[in-house]
């Protein structure tokens, strides 16, 4: 299966909606699209909506961690939302939830950033 990547910019927030599988086959494309958007726009925060993500492996974790570091370097925050149980388990095992905030849905994620 493939990965659909929807990027939406609201003010200085980048909303990334992923649908499908984020794995070693799709990670580089996802990383490049997000990185280019972050470099071209004055993005300060990222909301990562994983509601339609059906699978993620360690390559996907690497993409997320890389964008987290990129946004932290400009003083911003990343919030992840709508995480499925399988993906949540991977986040828990990796320890990413210790550094990245999680919210139930996109609206709550934007509110957590103070922009909704």
Swiss-Prot record:
Residues 3-113 form the STAS domain. One of its GO terms (biological process) is sporulation resulting in formation of a cellular spore. Phosphorylated by SpoIIAB on a serine residue. Keywords: Phosphoprotein, Sporulation. The modification Phosphoserine is found at residue 58. The keyword Phosphoprotein applies. The keyword Phosphoprotein applies. It comes from the Bacteria. GO terms for molecular function: anti-sigma factor antagonist activity; antisigma factor binding. In the phosphorylated form it could act as an anti-anti-sigma factor that counteracts SpoIIAB and thus releases sigma f from inhibition. Belongs to the anti-sigma-factor antagonist family. This is Anti-sigma F factor antagonist. It comes from Geobacillus stearothermophilus.
